[in-house]
Amino acid sequence: SIIVDDKEVTTLSNREVPELRRKIGTVFQDFRLLPKKTVFENVAFAMEVLHKSKRQIRKQVPQVLSLVGITDKAHKYPDELSAGEQQRVAIARAIINNPTVLIADEPTGNLDPITAAEIMDLLEQINMRGTTIVMVTHAKDIVDRMKKRVIAIEKGKIIRDEEGVYGFKEGVNTLE
């Protein structure tokens, strides 16, 4: 079962799904930024679709851009940013509405090792502020570095579910 905010998500009604969706932020490997919008506008868009006030947007967007370290890029367009900066914009957009859960699908997949480490540090900061991070990755070095709960899935079956045991070696620590 999957439980978010004390609700079993597989039994939610169609009416309840949008409410739950507002509590989940999503970050993709390919950033999925809106190319004709600035950094500020990309992040603000996530608030606009929830009908947040312009005042709230003007206040919160700079705060989140500061948190992810790209305040100086607010008026740039996605094609003017490095891959790491684009991922920071995607993370800012995902967390602007204070989600309970952040789903990160290969958030370091298109990044060089140094930038990937910086993004992982940023996700760690977000987690320490109270957001649960669910990350999909094939980067075993990141799994080992983060030292968090690891759930490995192979061919649709959970083969590992551990916390506190690290070292991602082939054939080791799998469930029977």
Which sequence ranges carry the predicted segments?
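Conserved ABC ATPase signature
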Residues: 77-81, 85-87
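Hydrophobic anchor residue at the start of the ABC signature
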Residues: 91
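Helix N-cap at the start of a conserved alpha-helix in ABC-type nucleotide-binding domains
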Residues: 113-115
